[in-house]
A protein has these predicted regions:
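Charged/polar positions within long, soluble alpha-helices
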Residues: 30, 37, 66-69, 73, ...
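Short amphipathic alpha-helical coiled-coil/interface segments
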Residues: 50-65
Length: 141
């Protein structure tokens, strides 16, 4: 299903590279949008140059996206800097979820969920509270 399953430490170690690639991708996207906005009025040599620039920038973005995929991560939203890492938390396959600006990976969400279902990793490490059933005595009671 996934080419790689990350630990939190492995995901954290990739963050400097992800920051670098996301910055390059955003720059290429901004240049692409500018070139596309100038295209309708361009004629002749200028139009051909813009078309070539657009092809180049699209190729750059596609190559960067393939590179991220080759690392085993999923780019969810370039503008927000959202990246998911397949991982195992509590025996379950989930996505570690990182948003650019965060210093480290601190959240995860189920495979079927997204950013809105993010939960702190520390919650996964904390066992659920034990509930006393009728007739049971609790320690210290």
């Amino acid at each position: 299903m996934f080419t790689r399953i990350f630990t939190k430490e492995e995901a954290d170690a990739l963050l400097p590279e992800l920051r670098r690639v996301l910055k390059e991708m955003r720059q290429a996207k901004a240049e692409l949008l500018l070139a596309q906005s100038r295209l309708p009025e361009a004629r002749g040599v200028e139009r051909r140059a813009l078309e070539e620039e657009i092809r180049f920038l699209m190729g750059t973005l596609e190559a960067d996206a393939r590179y991220l995929a080759s690392l085993g991560v999923l780019l969810k939203d370039l503008d927000r800097g959202l990246v998911d890492f397949p991982a195992r938390v509590g025996g379950e396959i989930v996505f570690l979820c990182w948003q650019e600006g965060e210093l480290e990976v601190t959240h995860y969400h189920p495979l079927s969920g997204g950013f809105a279902e993010r939960r702190p990793l520390e919650e996964a490490a904390t066992p659920p509270p034990k509930v006393a059933h009728p007739g049971e005595t609790r320690p210290g009671a």
